[in-house]
Amino acid sequence: AQFGRVSNERLICGPGLVNLYRALSEIAGEDPGGPLEPKDVTARAAAGDPRCVRTLDVFCAVFGAIAGDLVLTTGAWDGVFLTGGLVPRLLSSLQHSGFRQRFEHKGRFSPAMARVPTLAIVHPRPGLLGAAAFAVESFGPKT
């Protein structure tokens, strides 16, 4: 085992996608190959590579489970915004995977979870947009 414990933060990120690919390869008794980038895994999955498709399926399902757990933990009942460098590349996978099922599958809370929207932020610099909006609101002309 490369890591003694795998945190949510270590798993649901670009390097986590690569680590998951390597772990699933080793479990299957297959050689994970040389150095990989997250974009390699997503590109190979889009081309139909079964190992990469499986990696994305597992990644999206775990992502959904973690996002759902965070709603229950924080009470974010109005919605969850998915952000990060991987999100734009994963949109199709997220929509056609177990993401939403795992997000909603929370026992007696499942009906409430089904009403919580999940939205993807795909702008490359959402923080800059937010800062600009804040500047206009704070320092712009008052009407």
Placement of each model-derived feature along the sequence:
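ATP-binding/phosphotransfer module of carbohydrate and carboxylate kinases, centering on a glycine-rich
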Residues: Q2-T143
